[in-house]
Amino acid sequence: MGKQTNISIEVALDENKIPEKIVWSAPDGGVNEQEAQALLMSLWDGKNQETLRMDLWVKDMPIDQMNVFFHQSLVTMSQTFLRATKDE
């Protein structure tokens, strides 16, 4: 196996286990303790042929920002799918 790297996500929770703060780092990508308000993560389990997901957002994220976040995420997913498969 070649070089390995780490991407880390730290989530601060309130007393009810609701996210209050999300911080992520990807040192090889030049990201160090960058704060974020939301994340949508999907991982493919090829053995079981299913998607594993983790969707998080901080409790004080405004709905208008959530709308923009989802719109941009869906557009990006569409572009990534087209680039990866050439399937329109």
What annotation goes with each model-predicted range?
Residues 4, 20-86:
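Active-site- and interface-proximal helix/loop "cap" or "latch" segments in soluble metabolic
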Residues 1-9:
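Structured beta-strand/loop patches that form or line metal/cofactor-binding pockets in enzymes
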